């Protein structure tokens, strides 16, 4: 049975190479893994992502596991230029990596200054910022990160509310709130003020 699956993989790889669905280098790397040394040495994040896509196409769990293992290693050298690509890989595939999370938490201000951060969807922004381990000196810093992200897009009021819930308003002064309201589009201003007072009322009750 195993031999039959391996033969099917070989046929699939040859077919994919012929049809140019995956790059020739990735096809050869997969062949080397499946039929050769069974190791992956590349440190290219893009190549690993393509290999993982190929593993999913072939439904080859062993290849998936090896790609993840290699990506976990590459993640130890994550930096400003590739954090977004690595983050997206783990998030889109339902995976977690503690080193990635630690890097984001410790370098959140640098990360949020990148163009890649501005391109994230609302779920990703919430996932990144809704974490008590983030290293910042003031909660207003997080609020400014959200405001910067909002400057580059228009989201509906539900998504606006969702992303604002990552802010711990109990650490935001009314003066800081006023400054924030002046920075955002008019359609969001009343909603932000309402959220601020609503959260404070909840805290008073508790």
Curated annotation (Swiss-Prot):
Keyword Cell inner membrane present in the record's keywords: the answer is no
Q: What are the residue boundaries of the BACK domain, all occurrences included?
A: 99-181
Superkingdom of the source species:
Viruses
Q: Which segments cross the bilayer?
A: none
Against Pfam families, the record matches this protein to: BACK
**Induction remark:** Expressed in the early phase of the viral replicative cycle.
Q: Which keywords does this Swiss-Prot/TrEMBL entry list?
A: Early protein
The record's comment on protein family reads: Belongs to the orthopoxvirus OPG030 family.
Report the PANTHER family cross-referenced here: KELCH-LIKE PROTEIN 22, LD33804P
Name it. Answer: Protein OPG030
Native source species: Monkeypox virus
The gene behind this protein is OPG030
